[in-house]
Amino acid sequence: MHILLKIVIFAIKITKMDDKAIIKKRIDWFCKNKINAFSPTISPAPKSVERNEIESLYEGLRWFVDRGVNELLVQKKYMGSYCDIYLHKELTDSYLVSRNGYKINHLNRTQWLAALTDLHARFSWSGTAIRIIQSELMPWSALGKGLIANEFSAYYISHQIHADYLQQSDLYAKITQIRQKPEYKAFVADAKTLSSKELKDKYPNHIIRQYQSVRDMKLLDLPNYTKNISLFKKELDIFGKEAPIYFKPFNILKEIKDDGTEVFVNDNLSFQQINDDEFLHYTFADEADFEAKYPEIRAWVDKMNANEEGVVIKPRKAFLPAMPPAFKVRNNDYLTLIYGVDFQDRLQEQINKRNIKGKLKCSINDWAINAKLLQTPYADIHEENYEFKNLVLDRILGEEIENQLDSRL
């Protein structure tokens, strides 16, 4: 089937004309702006009920080892905004691309170019024109300031106001007094044994409404509630603070040479060329070797987790068939920021219902498409390259599936 016809057939599946126009515009924009990659979604590591871990370091490592991927990296997970850096020999020609494939144009160009100076200086540029580098744009507030203020800070303030009111009022004391009264206890006992009609015959309607409200009201453990709010605020202060723009690069995707030839790097160890942060690199001979080495990996992660989001687990080889790019293992303190102040109180419930199957499938598919996008020569990205446009379309359609998943995963 002709590739252009395939694009049309796929587009027919999009029901709204407005959506078709937007998607066509996005695809054309990809080509016009020379976007060579499209970030994948990253799945959390599998849970471990036995270890009481919602995102299990052990299970994430074991998942790869069980599938024959024995050379793995464990790196710090940075809490910012994902971006691809198109780093040019002439630094001022460089540009940034967001997670969804949009050129980032609304940041202060002078500031972010200055923040790339050290990264640029790490390389010899003899014979190389461009390097495409995966990175985290830091801090989170650089792109997420509005989200932080409107959602996370507002959420914290609402809970703090609620806690302050409960501590300062006598509401809980009054409810406790009512619950201790003999007549209330008699009502509760009757409500368990009498039919609805019998209960109405015995008690006036206003008494039934009052006692049912008192019975059904959940009283918070105020010391625990305030502790959870404080934890949420601590995490918000750590990750939501404002600071000058900087980058945490973590993988070189490919290099474009002056003569147009390209090097598809495909090696997560490129991290050490572009980042001085400590990371782990292990090769496991077999299952017993993994079990023997796991405690030292666990100890390193526990030490590193203080005031951080967590870690990512990656194969040494970046692109492997039917494999995700990474698993993320976020710690419980950070997950309080994502799931809310009662996350740790409801941890067992969250573990029981956690299901990463859909997220993992999307991650594997996204990464496979990204490999094909990157294998398209940079010089061949233009509006007449229908094979490339078809890959972009596949990836955009994949977003619709991802949008149906729990956004907190």
Which ranges hold each PLM region?
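Core catalytic machinery and nucleic-acid-binding channels of phosphodiester-processing enzymes
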Residues: 85, 127-129, 134-146, 150, ...
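Conserved loop->alpha-helix
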Residues: 95-141, 172
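Low-complexity, highly charged intrinsically disordered N-terminal segments
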Residues: 10-58, 82
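Generic structural signal of hydrophobic/aromatic residues within well-ordered alpha-helices
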Residues: 23-26, 60, 64, 112-122, ...
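Nucleic-acid 5′ end/cap handling module spanning
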Residues: 54-103, 146, 180, 184-409
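Eukaryote-specific, cytoplasm-facing alpha-helical/coiled-coil scaffolding segments in long proteins
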Residues: 158-165, 360-366
